[in-house]
Amino acid sequence: DAAHQVGALVVCCFDPTSLGLLKRPGDLGVDIAVAEGHTLGTPMLYGGPYLGIMTCREEFVRRLPGRIAGQTVDRSGRRCWVLTLQTREQHIRREKATSNICTNQGLFALRAAVYLSLMGPAGMKQVATLCQQKAAYAAAQMDTLDRFELAIEKPFFKEFVVRDKQNDVPSLLKYCRDKNVLAGVPLGQWYSEWDDCFLISVTEKRTKEEIDQLVSLLGSHGGGQS
């Protein structure tokens, strides 16, 4: 409300999987919402290509870049989906087009649509619940190690930041990699003030045994069980 009172729009970046548990951004007053669609059934693929998601309130639809899928009916009265509100520039003047989406992104958008249709609301809720529960378990286990602490004491979904009190994150993560475990992402490579921190992500695919193995491995590098 504070943003809208001064004429500003509210933009939100969200994790699509989290909506299996949380309210939609639009229900919280968000005007434009963006997301990385990689979590919707796409494997790692050596870092890409992936797909982006962007949605907004109806009054802004015609200003969206990209291709917009709309619902209509065919001549037999059956529901179908089409690319709608397409400008002429998308087909005849590429330099002025708002969308130059290539086949790669189209294929991954289709993959995401298939994944969502197969999962359904119940499936997405189950995946989101598993992500949240397993991440919470991993964070609680990390908090038992004297060497580490949670850097941000805020609610989280499936990612959390761990601080290494010995400030030796590169060596710590290399130690884990040498044992074929990707323990986390060092944040110091982007933010100098987070040089002693790394990000851990836990999804529905990780087992309790794998989480316990990670915690044990990190503890064996000098953390020690408390």
Where are these regions (language model features)?
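Conserved C-terminal alpha-helix-loop-beta "cap" of PLP-dependent enzymes
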Residues: 122-214
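Solvent-exposed, charged interface segments at domain starts and junctions
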Residues: 3, 12, 104-106, 122, ...
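Conserved PLP-enzyme active-site core in the AAT-like
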Residues: 1-82, 146-147, 162, 170-176, ...
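Generic structural signal for hydrophobic core residues of well-folded globular domains
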Residues: 116-119, 164, 218-221
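Active-site C-terminal subdomain of aminotransferase-like
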Residues: 40-146, 150-153
